[in-house]
């Protein structure tokens, strides 16, 4: 499902309609704020593989220059960006076919990007959760764990039941949440019997 997410200036104290920030890319698939306090616009400008970021803590500066750290990159992937999750000194970027990391390295390139997993794409923009063990996420036919370096398939006793019961025409509605006090991650999904 295509989304249209814009970077907006919103205050909880004002009863005003959120408006797009000047110079920020429009028609994004999603947003994430990195540990280094940059806003990543995912699928920026309607390009499903592009990530743009503003200058550090300056949501109005999106044009790269030698005097700032704004930038952009088109991921080398056949997939489309689905979600990004801040984790352990890096940002995990999940497409529908693979996984990448963005690590801050400073000027002139600002971020370094690396593919850390193949055949591990996610099916939803809300299916990943960062925990103290890493990022857990759901894919087309498996659950995965990004441990900070690589993506691993998770063995699961209820794998066949869950993946046999998911309504695949509604899988973009799957979402996850962590329950840290029990060391658990839960996924909520539309079942095969749902409309």
Per-region residue spans from a language model:
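Intrinsic-disorder/low-complexity coil detector
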Residues: 19, 24, 63, 69, ...
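Beta-strand initiation motifs
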Residues: 11-16, 60-67, 107-113, 152-154
């Amino acid at each position: 499902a295509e989304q249209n997410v814009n970077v907006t200036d919103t205050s909880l104290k004002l009863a005003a309609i959120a408006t797009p920030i000047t110079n920020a890319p429009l028609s994004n698939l999603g947003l994430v704020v990195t540990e280094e306090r940059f806003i990543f616009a995912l699928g920026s400008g309607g390009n499903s593989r592009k990530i743009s970021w503003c200058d550090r803590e300056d949501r109005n500066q999106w044009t790269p220059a030698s005097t700032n750290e704004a930038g952009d990159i088109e991921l080398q992937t056949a997939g489309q960006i689905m979600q990004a999750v801040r984790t352990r000194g890096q940002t995990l970027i999940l497409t529908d076919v693979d996984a990448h990391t963005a690590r801050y390295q400073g000027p002139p390139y600002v971020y370094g990007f690396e593919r850390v997993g193949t055949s591990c794409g996610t099916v939803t923009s809300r299916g990943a959760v960062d925990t103290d063990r890493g990022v857990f996420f759901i894919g087309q036919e498996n659950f995965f764990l990004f441990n900070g370096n690589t993506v691993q398939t998770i063995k699961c006793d209820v794998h066949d039941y869950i993946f046999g019961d998911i309504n695949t025409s509604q899988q973009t509605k799957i979402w996850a949440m962590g329950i840290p006090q029990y060391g658990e991650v839960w996924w909520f999904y539309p079942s095969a019997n749902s409309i």
